[in-house]
């Protein structure tokens, strides 16, 4: 069974220590609820990942663990087969002892768009909401973060993260918790909170913004990336049914509307630092994610539209600062 004891130990003398009042019981219940299904099979695979300490580790410019020269061809093939059990791999890419995991998303491209605009992560405590397999968490560590915590309720994503962590060495202060943000108490402790690719999946985007705010210390920084559409501060798209074949997309605001939402939630220093139309090169099917991808979600006769006729995916990154609460509104 995947253990969270090292995380408890790392936060016992940190700004997150009060989380220990509730977190062990929540994760204990999660473990009891997942004794069956795919998780036990995946954990057996994780237990087979015994490899020498990597001769190269790079989280600054990529996520690379090992040069590939430490393993024989047979050992590398075995590793590739083990990692293949965790398909589909959506966020990456990873280079693991010479095994190149070409994921559906070029998450490194998103990181390169975002990182020049954020406050330096050196010595900061960071939360990544909806972290997926944890690719960006490793890049946050590469920027010098003191602690990185990722939350995502997916057992598969957790096992993908654990596979990478076991190959990297478990001593790194990067931890995945299989939780949704609604399961977190107001911690008021993180220096930076990332929410990238989550907001449009939430039925109540304002509530989600408040949940993000509750995790930040006063003066902490929010990095919010989500789907947007063109328009003024009153423009919000609510898909009638599906958007890009997804049935869990609820609200797509304009950039101005999104910034207004953040202002209403008592954030300051709100700025849009990037707007980018998702390209077919950034999101596509690969050997490691052989299912449908972006090209299948767009109108074959007009890639500026989804198959439903809505504007094709465009993503904006907004950065904002948690303000002191306005006591007149409490």
UniProtKB/Swiss-Prot annotation:
Pfam families: Methyltransf_9
A molecular function (GO) term: transferase activity, transferring alkyl or aryl (other than methyl) groups
Statement: the UniProt record of this protein carries the keyword Protein transport: no
SS bond partners: none
InterPro entries per record: CmoB, Mo5U34_MeTrfas-like, SAM-dependent_MTases_sf
UniProt KW keywords: Transferase, tRNA processing
Binding site for carboxy-S-adenosyl-L-methionine: 91, 105, 110, 130, 152-154, 181-182, 196, 200, 315
This enzyme's EC code(s): 2.5.1.-
Gene Ontology terms: biological process: tRNA wobble uridine modification
Catalysed reaction, written as an equation: carboxy-S-adenosyl-L-methionine + 5-hydroxyuridine(34) in tRNA = 5-carboxymethoxyuridine(34) in tRNA + S-adenosyl-L-homocysteine + H(+)
Keyword tRNA processing: yes
The protein's role, per its UniProt record: Catalyzes carboxymethyl transfer from carboxy-S-adenosyl-L-methionine (Cx-SAM) to 5-hydroxyuridine (ho5U) to form 5-carboxymethoxyuridine (cmo5U) at position 34 in tRNAs.
Oligomer status and interactors: Homotetramer.
Similarity-based family: Belongs to the class I-like SAM-binding methyltransferase superfamily. CmoB family.
Protein name, as recorded: tRNA U34 carboxymethyltransferase
Organism of origin: Shewanella pealeana (strain ATCC 700345 / ANG-SQ1)
């Amino acid at each position: 069974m995947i253990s969270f004891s090292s995380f408890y130990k790392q936060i016992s003398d940190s700004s997150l220590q009060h989380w220990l009042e509730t977190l062990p019981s929540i994760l204990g219940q999660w473990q009891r609820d997942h004794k069956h299904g795919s998780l036990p099979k995946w954990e057996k695979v994780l237990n087979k990942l015994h490899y020498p300490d990597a001769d190269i580790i790079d989280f600054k410019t990529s996520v690379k663990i090992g040069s590939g020269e430490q393993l024989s061809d047979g050992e590398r093939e075995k590793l590739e087969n083990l990692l293949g059990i965790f398909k589909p791999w959506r966020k990456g890419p990873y280079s693991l002892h010479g095994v190149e995991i070409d994921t559906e998303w070029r998450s490194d491209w998103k990181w390169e768009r975002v990182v020049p605009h954020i406050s330096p992560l050196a010595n900061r405590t960071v939360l990544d909401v909806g972290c997926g397999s944890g690719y960006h968490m490793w890049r946050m560590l590469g920027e010098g973060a003191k602690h990185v915590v990722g939350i995502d309720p997916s057992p598969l994503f957790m096992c993908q993260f654990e596979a990478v962590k076991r190959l990297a060495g478990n001593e790194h202060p990067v931890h995945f918790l299989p939780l949704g943000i609604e399961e977190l108490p107001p911690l008021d402790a993180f220096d930076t909170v990332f929410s990238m690719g989550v907001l449009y999946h939430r039925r109540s985007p304002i509530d989600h913004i408040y949940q993000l705010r509750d995790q930040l210390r006063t003066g902490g920084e929010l990095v919010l990336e989500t789907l947007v559409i063109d328009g003024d501060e009153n423009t919000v798209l609510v898909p009638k049914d599906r958007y890009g074949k997804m049935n869990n997309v609820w609200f797509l605001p304009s950039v101005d509307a999104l910034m207004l939402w953040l202002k209403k939630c008592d954030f300051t220093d709100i700025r849009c630092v990037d707007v980018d139309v998702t390209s077919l090169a950034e999101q596509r099917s690969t050997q490691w994610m052989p299912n449908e991808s972006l090209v299948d979600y767009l109108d074959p006769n007009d890639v500026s539209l989804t198959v439903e006729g809505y504007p094709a995916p465009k993503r904006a990154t907004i950065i904002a600062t948690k303000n002191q609460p306005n006591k007149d509104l409490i």
